[in-house]
Amino acid sequence: MTATLERRQAQGLWDRFADWVTSTHNRFYVGWFGVLMIPTLLSATICFVIAFVAAPPVDMDGIREPISGSLLYGNNIITGAVIPSSNAIGLHFYPIWEAASMDEWLYNGGPYQLVVFHFLIGVFCYLGREWELSYRLGLRPWICIAYSAPVAAATAVFLVYPIGQGSFSDGMPLGISGTFNFMFVFQAEHNILNHPFHMLGVAGVFGGALISAMHGSLVTSSLVSETSYEESQNYGYKFGQAEETYNISAAHGYISRLVFQYFAFWGANSRSLHFIMAAFPVIGIWFTSLGISVMAFNLNGFNFNSSIVDSQGRAIYTWADIVNRANLGMEVMHERNAHNFPLDLAGTESAPVAVSTAKVGG
């Protein structure tokens, strides 16, 4: 019998790079999506930090009245932001080479587009990287599906909404006060609080938080005690141990007795329980993202502009009227120099600023 030995061919540089990129033994999994994710997120982060600290004022409304957003121009951590690109730019792609000078690019809010586009590409790649690592480890794809909820939300406020409104100046500013300003203006223009998709999102986030708190407290409370009465119950569990030490039947029985017998049907086994925990907030945020996307094209929330009137034709004010007045007030205040008279106020009869209160003791 003859044995033939062949010398193993040395791997080329590309093959070694590919093995390193796709290796699941690295402390930090890179992956092919990571090859694009790392530079885009680094670019977005570096540009955001520089712009947040030192960017000059930006003519966001396109009326030659720049808005200061950086720390060096008088803002603090709360009021600072990367200001959206100018309304004069609209939806045009505005990289550095499209401007006549760096000063012009900064004045028109070019850093906002740079940060947003690189950030969106980065989070898309992070989602793909989650799928890629799950695939290589033989896991199911639910991790990246769950992550698609915040990705959809970011895409809605940074990309879909500006496209629907016709300008990146309507995108969400990259700062704390800017985020709240975006929320107020969104409520004023679209009445998002009365949109059913937003209601589903609120139910999903709050319901998910409730389920998470219930689950964590139940698991912690139903640890199997493997200790004697003289020892602390905490000695019955070692942090990081492989085997389960809690009793799901005990937790299930607790919930069924605490509320009612059939309430805990979805927690009858670990799979159904954790599916509900994942699906509840994810589906809610999906609906909120979809709601922002349809309101981007002015398919707005419900409005109750027609007040209830009595037999004499006098208005009977409801909470809907209070919300309408608040919306009008917020719309008057935002972009007050660009819009001297908002259209929905100019086209109707003047309305009192406040609802009159009943006389006391009269």
UniProtKB/Swiss-Prot annotation:
Site feature: Cleavage: 346-347
Key words, A-Z: Calcium, Cell inner membrane, Cell membrane, Chlorophyll, Chromophore, Electron transport, Herbicide resistance, Iron, Magnesium, Manganese, Membrane, Metal-binding, Oxidoreductase, Photosynthesis, Photosystem II, Transmembrane, Transmembrane helix, Transport
EC number: 1.10.3.9
Chief localisation class: membrane
Binding site for chlorophyll a ChlzD1: 118
Disulphide bond pairs: none
Entry GO MF terms: chlorophyll binding; electron transporter, transferring electrons within the cyclic electron transport pathway of photosynthesis activity; iron ion binding; oxidoreductase activity, acting on diphenols and related substances as donors, oxygen as acceptor; oxygen evolving activity
Binding-site list for [CaMn4O5] cluster: 170, 189, 334-335, 344, 346
Propeptide: 347-362
Site (Tyrosine radical intermediate): 161
Membrane spanning stretches: 29-46, 118-133, 142-156, 197-218, 276-290
Location within or outside the cell: Cell inner membrane
Keyword Cytoplasm annotated: no
Binding residue positions for chlorophyll a PD1: 198
A GO CC annotation given for this chain: plasma membrane
Purpose of the protein: Photosystem II (PSII) is a light-driven water:plastoquinone oxidoreductase that uses light energy to abstract electrons from H(2)O, generating O(2) and a proton gradient subsequently used for ATP formation. It consists of a core antenna complex that captures photons, and an electron transfer chain that converts photonic excitation into a charge separation. The D1/D2 (PsbA/PsbD) reaction center heterodimer binds P680, the primary electron donor of PSII as well as several subsequent electron acceptors.
Protein's name in the database: Photosystem II protein D1 3
Organism expressing this protein natively: Gloeobacter violaceus (strain ATCC 29082 / PCC 7421)
